[in-house]
């Protein structure tokens, strides 16, 4: 039976890792063993940060909504509670966009929330 030589698969694997390491500094983009460590760590960071990005954006949206609501005399939590009581179901992403780009529309939403809280 013929001996199995794995030069082709090894070369392909090395090429794949070095391609992923393109742009890294120094030997991190030239040497397979070093590149492999850097690529694995980069992939771990990418996996972790895809999840963290969702948290970060939600926090950013909440900060923007809070800033917009406080301009009109409401805190974030009271504003959101007022919207819920008024039956207005708009998600935080859209609310933050409205607060940043359309202050007049956001003011109308704040007034609706205040009415619902007063009732």
Curated annotation (Swiss-Prot):
Annotated InterPro entries: Ribosomal_bL20 (IPR005813), RIBOSOMAL_L20_CS (IPR049946), Ribosomal_protein_bL20_C (IPR035566)
One GO cellular component term, please give it. Answer: ribonucleoprotein complex
Any one Gene Ontology MF annotation carried by this entry is: rRNA binding
Which residue stretches, if any, does this entry annotate as coiled coil? Answer: none
Q: Which UniProt keywords apply?
A: Ribonucleoprotein, Ribosomal protein, RNA-binding, rRNA-binding
Sorted alphabetically, the Gene Ontology BP terms of this entry are: ribosomal large subunit assembly; translation
Amino-acid biosynthesis: present as a keyword of the record? no
Superkingdom of source? Bacteria
Family membership: Belongs to the bacterial ribosomal protein bL20 family.
Q: What does this protein do?
A: Binds directly to 23S ribosomal RNA and is necessary for the in vitro assembly process of the 50S ribosomal subunit. It is not involved in the protein synthesizing functions of that subunit.
The name this protein goes by in its record: Large ribosomal subunit protein bL20
Originating organism: Rhodospirillum centenum (strain ATCC 51521 / SW)
Q: Which gene encodes it?
A: rplT
